[in-house]
Design a protein with these regions (language model features):
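Active-site-adjacent structural elements that line small-molecule/cofactor binding pockets in enzymes
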Residues: 1-205
Length: 205
């Protein structure tokens, strides 16, 4: 909530490139699902099918409060689940879509603007809580992991695969590594210590 808006940045990147894939970090709940379905499908069309969504339910209460979002952790994931149901229903429909859920309700949503990709824009997802794993099992095309010790990554993948299998799904997996670069090795290690402290502070919240 304190950085440039992701969809606008993604539109600029897509317009300035021809082959680069665009992974848009997208938080459900800010924009109504039918409007979001049209906006994202439009961006996928204009980028010639280069868009993917990193769906972020939100893990920092202070950050979410800046945008007026006060749902607690598990309720955010319940909303995300419903939001993704709605998006996928609109993107894959052959006619107007009605939806009556706990968080979203609409009638006659038009699927006229479709994503370039079929059956829909790829959905990336992450999160280690039970609530996050449940949503990932139902919706994630690719489940994202941080670079952690091998045993932890293996255990996480097994957990997600088991949950997805129960839903008849088999997602892909990605692992992200973020190198710390500085002018000197000493400066890089100093920066690494600062990052570690930030991570510890965030986990303690």
């Amino acid at each position: 909530s304190n950085a440039a808006e992701g969809a606008v940045v993604s539109s600029f990147v897509a317009a300035a490139t021809r082959r680069l894939g665009v992974l848009l970090a997208y938080r459900p709940g800010v924009i109504a699902a039918p409007l979001a379905a049209r906006q994202l499908a439009t961006l996928d069309q204009f980028s010639e099918g280069r868009l993917a969504l990193n769906v972020v339910s939100g893990g920092n209460d202070e950050d979410l409060a800046r945008d007026g979002d006060y749902l607690d952790h598990d309720r955010r994931y319940a909303r995300t689940d419903e939001y993704l149901q709605a998006l996928r229903a609109i993107w894959t429909a052959t006619g107007p879509v009605d939806f009556d859920g706990e968080f979203y309700r609409f009638q006659g949503a038009s699927p006229a603007v479709r994503p370039r990709q079929s059956p829909h824009i790829p959905i990336y997802f992450s999160g280690s809580s039970d609530a996050a794993i449940e949503v990932a099992a139902r919706h994630a095309d690719t489940y994202m992991l941080w670079g952690e010790p091998l045993a932890a990554v293996d255990g996480h993948i097994r957990r997600v695969r088991a949950a997805a299998k129960a839903q008849g799904r088999d997602p892909r997996f990605s692992v992200s590594f973020r190198p710390i670069v500085a002018d000197t090795e000493e400066a890089a290690w100093k920066r690494a210590a600062e990052v570690l402290e930030q991570v510890r502070e965030n986990r303690a919240r």
